[in-house]
């Protein structure tokens, strides 16, 4: 029986029971001692694939831990689940859909049927449509209402229509096509639109309205604001089609807005928003870095797809990272996971991974509707590593919670300045080393005595200088952030999330919690604006509505 129809109670499986016992045996495990006694530890717990090098040796694991986690993956049927996803089975059971974002990066000639129809010709037709548009804009052939070429592209979208494309276009700025600047408009806060409008000219700006339904509130409101601004700047309704295109499955609504049908790029219901940067949602990426680099991005992701499908679990990067997350979340009570990129251009990867992980695995029922028997997705947080060292790394080192971390660092900088990059790389390694090693009481005391401090002061200050250590982390190293390697990196995290959903028996491809807030937002808006005098369902919400109505001006 398919895993998504009858998910296992993972806590009843033999491997889970064995992991419980193993966890007790690991209570006093010391990574410091493990490295001191096993010269092969680094080589045993490292691997490379698709241009990524993973060091997971700084984890609270032994080879037995890895074997037990791999056994757990086998017992929940992970191999069959991976095949089910790639074959287009209805792994998104609550919506009755497949989850086939991986199809978007498959090469020409592959075949994949959904409801009996091969979808691959459509996938490559849209890629060709994107290639044509990008070429026309980059060659200066797509012109605005004053016949000037396009210089600015504004992507209007939110969630997956924004976070992934923004991450990639900023991470690959070294590959940017000169002459076209890309901007993102997501928030419904008018200040964001105001600031953007100060940077662009209507006559040379192309807006991409990215919304599957063409009815997403924030996106539609921003599109309407952009349309009104364009008209106020001298644009006309007749020439609107030169300045607005859409990525949507609702052609009728896009056409009614003023977008020509040939400038509407399709979306499929088998691609979820947070997995959609590989589709026409990635148009701003292609416009930023060129279509050949966009295809390199797809190629890197496809290489990771192949690794995920074929590598044995004990040598499978996404599988191991997913299993380590289960190990810490379910057996060590870790509640969050830090993503720490040591690269300025990767500064937005944490935001993308927050949505990818938390929207996918923030679930409390299994695929069959029964409650989960374990904790599920952690809080994902973090930020640029060097900056974080002077902010929240303190909590990682001396806080009371265990917070596993992923360090991500390139070997080569696109913009070398003196020895800055050597220091950046050194800081990345030293942070993971410090988390693992810590500082003992004896070491703290010896350090203070060396400074000539009297014994009373030593004993007073030493407890504050103790760093527990034994804090787990992974280090992901790439030679440099290229389209191909970035594609592999993002795809790796997609697969990691899927692995964990299979272990927990949850659906990684729906997001009903998001829908509830949207529906309630409409009702609150009606009460705020006087559309209804009906009271809110609770006194707090009604009180805040009244507070707003009594003070709002404008």
From Swiss-Prot:
Domain of life of the native organism: Bacteria
Keyword Isomerase: yes
GO CC, one annotated term: cytosol
Annotated HAMAP family: G6P_isomerase (MF_00473)
KW Nucleotide-binding (keyword) present: no
Gene label: pgi
SUPFAM superfamilies: SIS domain (SSF53697)
Active site: residue positions: 359, 390, 518
Name of the featured protein: Glucose-6-phosphate isomerase
Reactions catalysed according to its record: alpha-D-glucose 6-phosphate = beta-D-fructose 6-phosphate
UniProt-listed Enzyme Commission number(s): 5.3.1.9
Annotated pathway: Carbohydrate biosynthesis; gluconeogenesis; Carbohydrate degradation; glycolysis; D-glyceraldehyde 3-phosphate and glycerone phosphate from D-glucose: step 2/4
